[in-house]
A protein has these predicted regions:
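Non-catalytic accessory segments adjacent to catalytic cores
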Residues: 83-129
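Beta-hairpin (beta-strand-turn-beta-strand) motif
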Residues: 74-78, 106-109, 134-136
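Active-site/acyl-donor-binding loops of N-acyltransferases
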Residues: 2, 35-36, 43-45, 62-65, ...
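Aromatic (often tryptophan-rich) hydrophobic motifs at membrane interfaces
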Residues: 57-58, 65-70, 76-79, 83-98, ...
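A conserved beta-strand-loop-helix scaffold within acyl/acetyltransferase catalytic domains
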Residues: 3-51, 55-66, 111-126, 138, ...
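Residues at or immediately flanking beta-strands
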Residues: 103, 161-163, 268
């Protein structure tokens, strides 16, 4: 097997993306998504060939400065072959000498082999879960797979006249962010910065890899969702709701999203990941229950951190604390 590393100006987008779509279909492994990997980092495109054919691809990021950088992956490679992953990490370490590897993202990564992470030296491993709805089913079967309470809420929202629409421009991104700010203030959570959404929109909108959807009632936004997608798979990235929204508006929103994506020919709708362990009554419990009631297959996934150079990692942690 031969492993090669390319930078963004060296990779052939059509060929890279075609292989991603033929395998994992993960939208965060497409070349367009790498446009978000900037600032103090840059994307690297790792591919492995055997007998003249590509058998493995992985888009990752190098963060930091020369001689003091770390490796980060937002999502899984195209397969979980232990030999390929070991070769990929070995090749990256030889070229860039990262002091650690951070491979963990609740929203986008779907790596299912905990044993492989342990074999590669990941000492801090996180477990999480996600439910994925198969859109290749009939619309009737998809609706039957939704929990009865969600179905009743969807019907109620329809009777109340809740409407569904897709955002078309940056003004809708602003509209989404305004609602998300209110959501996080209400739940005492921490929202991501507005420029994260604007940059994601600018990088991914033209290629159709990011979309914003809304549910409104009497011209007032009730609920919104941000979807990151490929032609095969859509992932629910972020959501926002109005305080005291019309009953069922959020349920209705995701049902309409699933129907639209099915009509467009997508195969899967991923409701995004959540931690597996939480205390009863925690707000995470309500979020998990809301997602799981849309049906689909619930699976466990893993991520974590592997330290290659302990003293550099200690310095890095101290630096973060100072900031």
């Amino acid at each position: 097997m031969h492993c090669s590393i390319r930078l963004i100006d060296e990779v052939e987008q059509e060929i890279w993306d075609q292989y991603i779509l033929e395998t994992s279909g993960n939208p965060t492994q497409l070349v367009s998504y790498s446009k978000l990997m900037h600032g103090n980092g840059f994307p690297i495109f790792v591919s492995i060939e055997a007998d003249g054919k590509v058998i493995f691809q992985w888009l990752l990021t190098i963060r930091g400065q020369r001689n003091f950088c770390f490796l980060q992956a937002f999502s899984e490679p195209t397969n979980e072959d232990s030999g390929c992953i070991e070769l990929a990490i070995k090749t990256i370490r030889a070229q860039y000498h990262p002091f650690k590897f951070v491979f963990y993202d609740l929203a986008f990564s779907r790596f299912s082999n905990r044993t492989l992470l342990e074999q590669q030296g990941f000492s801090e491993i996180h477990e999480y879960q996600a439910n994925v709805v198969d859109l290749r089913q009939s619309e009737e079967d998809i609706f039957k797979g939704i929990h009865s309470k969600h179905r009743n809420s969807i019907r109620r929202a329809e009777r109340e006249g809740v409407q569904f629409f897709e955002g078309k421009d940056s003004a809708d991104v602003e509209r989404y962010y305004h609602l998300s700010q209110a959501t996080y203030q209400r739940t005492q959570g921490k929202n991501v910065e507005k420029n994260v959404f604007l940059e994601a929109y600018q990088a991914l909108h033209d290629s159709g890899n990011i979309r914003f959807f809304f549910a409104q009632h009497d011209s007032e936004i009730q609920s919104a969702a941000t979807i990151v997608m490929s032609p095969k798979r859509a992932v629910y990235w972020k959501g926002a709701t109005k305080s005291k929204e019309i009953t069922g508006a959020s349920n209705f929103l995701h049902w309409e999203i699933m129907k639209l994506l099915k009509k467009e020919g997508l195969d899967f709708y991923d409701l995004s990941g959540n931690i597996s362990s939480y205390e009863q009554g925690d707000k995470v419990e309500g979020i998990v229950r809301f997602k799981h009631r849309f049906g689909g297959v619930i699976s466990k996934y893993y991520g974590g951190e592997c330290v290659f150079c302990l003293w550099k990692n200690i310095l890095f942690d101290l630096y973060k604390k100072i900031l």
